[in-house]
UniProtKB/Swiss-Prot annotation:
This is NAD(P)H-quinone oxidoreductase subunit 5, chloroplastic. Its EC number is 7.1.1.-. GO terms for biological process: ATP synthesis coupled electron transport; electron transport coupled proton transport. NDH is composed of at least 16 different subunits, 5 of which are encoded in the nucleus. Belongs to the complex I subunit 5 family. InterPro entries: NADH_UbQ_OxRdtase_chlpt_su5_C, NADHpl_OxRdtase_5_subgr, ND/Mrp_TM, NU5C-like, Proton_antipo_N. The chain crosses the membrane at residues 9-29, 40-60, 89-109, 125-145, 147-167, 185-205, 219-239, 258-278, 283-303, 327-347, 354-374, 396-416, 425-445, 549-569, 605-625, 718-738. It comes from Athroisma gracile. It is found in: Plastid, Chloroplast thylakoid membrane. NDH shuttles electrons from NAD(P)H:plastoquinone, via FMN and iron-sulfur (Fe-S) centers, to quinones in the photosynthetic chain and possibly in a chloroplast respiratory chain. The immediate electron acceptor for the enzyme in this species is believed to be plastoquinone. Couples the redox reaction to proton translocation, and thus conserves the redox energy in a proton gradient.
């Protein structure tokens, strides 16, 4: 076992040859490298598979022995300062390594087909392999200096992949936004690292935690300064994991290719922030104020992410806000001290979210056959619907991922989210109410995404579709969608969402209608599809190739069974608790993972009931338009005009505006922060040029003019210069004399 640990340093470096060889190949043999470009996908998958096998071997050894291994090389600069580089293998490292490699392999296999048409195929795989190297280096780091180095490399790879299609202005802007937002957090992280080094004199985790605990127990530190340094460290995690208020980059990051969205949201970029807080938990747990602050940021992000996901029309942005909310749950759990629950949810969410993103990529891929390559159209749920019969495998996989994220048993996220929800009652009833309510919102918006994408009819085939924003069909609102006009005058249909001219939503039309015939028999799709600039379009979408479906099917298995790793029914079968034994013993010395069956069933029934209610509301608001009901008296009974109806419409409109406009946070940033920074820059530029530079320039200019005047008066004679010189000296002496008299 010791010998296995000794070679663990190679984990981050195994995927590194791929980007290096691609770069050398493009530099020395560009034609041959491009002609054999599909070969690099196999090499990337092979090397990452070796890392996965090695990581699993380490994990099995840790489960059996509950050990932590650390190896350090010291680089002594002088007697007072030395840099230490090494690697740390503990349960957190092994969990993250398996997560990164398994999801990474699935994404690489998927990308081989998804990116096959792209001219940047080689560049994409070079970035992806370097991304894996950076993230693996981050999770195996043994000190804060290494953490920061790989932290920046992870960010750099994310920026490169977000702006992968850099010729598109929207993608370039999204890349810049991600970079600038994360600069704020990264600068805070750097200051926090330097602050704790100033306090403890060490960057190594084992020394840092021990020295800091001794200082705290002896009351030898300034708690205000310590809290400030901890907040600065946490700022890095806030930006990386898209927590409020530095979350604004995450939805715009969807401008990158869909496979990288899956990797970023499941196991790399956003998971890095959760990993950092989990790694530094021994540091944070002895500072009560910072733990409260972490949980506060987490619960705000939980609710904010869920509300912002309610009205998104872009399928990837809806999933992005879902990720933001679920990361909030993890951060809430860490702030509450529920280390096991947070990591459990990190695992289950990673596979479920990877499944959803790869499923959305399959949908987008199939929609491009209809609308051509245009992300605004191919990712727009307004133009989707009715995909069930065209992409059945993608539909079923997406449904499983949706139900998992909703918290429906026995799927993965049910087990982990339920633990966090139950722990929240013990921490704060207010936080618990918000967390449980958000569970219902999660079920609603995820079911909404599923229904808009797969149920009903294919909206791109509807009559009068032009792709313009002001058309009624384009403007699908928060709560439902609008059907095409039917030429049959006897046709009656309840319009669940009647869009007004200004695009504002209302739930129901102002009239009560009666359905005389079967909707599915009456609505006929119109196949007149406009030309979107891609000549290779077809009338209907089709299922993706097997290369793209294989990773989706594997992720279905993870979504079905990975949750059973952490079911605490029996200590002997609770693999996750055995896995995390060293960390749990460090953080929670008196922890007891035994579970009360009655309490578990009671809480599970309550959580499933809330999720089911959210799903029911989503079906109620969306499904009836496409159902085969002969009589809609139940729905018509809700359609009544009155003061209550008007008031409810105003509430719905406010919710829609809040959600669709991203909580006005981007508008606030653009109006106040961006404009304020520009005005501050203009003021500093004016102050620097006119005041700072103006004073010495003015003195020099004045001296020049005085010299010119004296030169003209003196006439070039030395006697005149001497006369004026002594005259001025006499005048200054007289002035000095009278002032001091």
């Amino acid at each position: 076992m010791e010998q296995t640990y000794q070679y663990a340093w190679i984990i981050p470096f195994l995927p590194l040859p791929v980007p290096m060889l691609i770069g050398l190949g493009l530099l020395l043999f560009p034609t041959a490298t491009k002609s054999l470009r599909r070969m690099w996908a196999f090499q990337s998958v092979l090397l990452l598979s070796i890392v996965m096998i090695f990581s699993m071997n380490l994990s099995i050894q840790q489960i059996n022995s509950s050990s932590v291994y650390q190896y350090v090389w010291s680089w002594i600069i002088n007697n007072d300062f030395s840099l230490e580089f090494g690697y740390l293998i503990d349960p957190l490292t092994s969990i993250m390594s398996i997560l990164i490699t398994t999801v990474g392999i699935m994404v690489l296999i998927y990308s081989d087909n998804y990116m096959s048409h792209d001219h940047g195929y080689l560049r994409f795989f070079a970035y992806m392999s370097f991304f894996s190297t950076s993230m693996l280096g981050l999770v195996t780091s043994s000190n804060l200096i290494q953490i920061y180095i790989f932290w920046e490399l992870v960010g750099m790879c994310s920026y490169l992949l977000i702006g992968f299609w850099f010729t598109r202005p929207v993608a370039a802007k999204a890349c810049q936004k991600a970079f600038v937002t994360n600069r704020v957090g990264d600068f805070g992280l750097l200051l926090g690292i330097l602050g704790f080094y100033w306090i403890t004199g060490s960057f190594e985790f084992r020394d840092l935690f021990q020295i800091f605990n001794n200082l705290i127990s002896n009351n030898e530190v300034n708690f205000l300064f310590v809290t400030l340094c901890a907040v600065l460290l946490f700022a890095g995690a806030i930006a990386k994991s898209a927590q409020f208020p530095l979350h604004v980059w995450l939805p715009d990051a969807m401008e990158g290719p869909t496979p990288i969205s899956a990797l970023i949201h499941a196991a790399t970029m956003v998971a890095a922030g959760i990993f950092l807080v989990a790694r530094l938990m021994p540091l944070f747990i002895v500072i009560p104020h910072i733990m409260n602050f972490i949980s506060l940021i987490g619960i705000i992000t939980v609710f904010l992410g869920a509300t912002l996901a309610l009205a998104q029309k872009d399928i990837k942005r809806g999933l992005a806000y879902s990720t933001m909310s679920q990361l909030g749950y993890m951060m809430l759990a860490l702030g509450m001290g529920s280390y096991r629950s947070a990591l459990f949810h990190l695992i289950t969410h990673a596979y479920s979210k990877a499944l959803l993103f790869l499923g959305s990529g399959s949908v987008i891929h199939s929609m491009e056959t209809l609308v051509g390559y245009c992300p605004k159209k191919s990712q727009n749920m307004v133009l989707m619907g009715g995909l069930t019969k065209h992409v059945p495998i993608t539909k079923n996989s997406f449904l499983l991922g949706t139900l998992s994220l909703c918290g429906i048993p026995p799927l993965a996220c049910f087990w982990s989210k339920d633990e966090i929800l139950n722990d929240s009652w013990l921490y704060s009833p207010i936080f618990a109410i918000i967390a449980w309510s958000t569970a219902g919102l999660t079920a609603f918006y995820m079911c909404r995404i599923y229904l808009l994408t797969f149920e009903g009819h294919l909206n791109v085939h509807f009559q009068n579709y032009s792709g313009k924003r002001n058309t009624p069909l384009y403007s699908i609102s928060l709560w439902g969608k609008e059907g095409s006009k039917i030429s049959n005058k006897n046709f009656r249909l309840v319009t669940l969402l009647k869009m007004k001219k200004n695009g504002r939503p209302s739930f129901f039309s102002n009239k009560v209608y009666k359905m005389d015939e079967n909707v599915r028999n009456l609505i006929q799709p119109f196949l007149s599809i406009p030309n979107f600039g891609n000549t290779k379009t077809s009338l209907y979408p089709y299922e993706s190739d097997n290369t793209m479906l294989f990773p989706i099917l594997i992720l279905i298995l993870f979504t079905l069974f990975v949750g059973f790793l952490g079911i605490p029914f029996n200590q002997d079968v609770d693999i996750l608790s055995k896995w995390l034994t060293p960390s749990i013993n460090l953080l929670h010395k008196n922890s007891n993972n035994s579970i009360d069956w009655y309490e578990f069933c009671k809480d599970a029934v309550f959580s499933v009931s809330i999720a089911s209610f959210g799903i029911f509301i989503a079906f109620f608001l969306y499904k009836p338009v496409y159902s085969s009901f002969q009589n809609l008296d139940l729905i018509n009974s809700f359609v009544k005009i009155g003061p209550k109806r008007i008031f409810s419409d105003k509430i719905k409109k406010a919710i829609y505006d809040w959600s669709y406009n991203r909580g006005y946070i981007d508008a606030f940033d653009g109006t106040f922060l961006t404009v304020g920074m520009r005005k501050l820059a203009e003021f500093t530029h004016f102050f620097d040029r006119r005041i700072i530079d103006g004073i010495p320039n003015g003195v020099g200019l004045m001296s020049f003019f005085v010299a010119e005047v004296i030169k003209s008066v003196g006439g070039g004679r030395i006697s005149s210069y001497l006369f004026f010189y002594f005259s001025y000296v006499s005048i200054f002496l007289l002035i000095y004399y009278f002032l001091n008299y």
